[in-house]
Amino acid sequence: MFGTMIEIENALPKDIATINVKFIKKIINEVCKGYVTKIVWRDNKYIPPVEEHLKVTLITCFYWAINCIALVVFEENVTKEVLEWMSTFPPIVKDSCIVSRLMDDIVAHEFETERNNVATAVTCHMKEYGTTKEEASEVLWDVVENAWKDMNKEYLNRTDIPASLLVRVINLARMMETMYNEIDGYTDSAILKNRISLLLEKPISF
């Protein structure tokens, strides 16, 4: 992971490389702390309340880090203010992570449970509220829908952050929704073949 940081630093202009990579490393450190917490949960078979679960897994899903890396690598003339904004785990990024994390947990719940991984948000909801898997999934789908509404509102109303950056955050959520829409396309990537083929072979013209 930090080897990748070195590659990014070497690829960036020297006048911004150190500052920008330091910014990314700070976020990666938070991700690694979350990984340690998840290992403890798994080894102790701990099923946290939903809020505690999301406080960690919204970070470890790595989408905040991906947005940070994309900002530094692909966005030109990134200001200090924008970097500081991104470092706060802003609402639109958090909502993007909610979409990604919860959709993954819903569609991959059985697979993750069978391999004794960290409890999914579905399992956490079932334990905390005494719900069935179906009831928990329905509640979490509503959370995903609300996250989409909040992301769209933030995109339309935010004027101090470049629209190109905001839409990149939303596009990541769109990609994850495609990957986890009723299927676990990450675990079984072959099922995404037709969708990828359509994108590459029959793209929609604008």
Predicted regions mapped to residue ranges:
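Alpha-helical, largely C-terminal catalytic domains
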Residues: 1-206
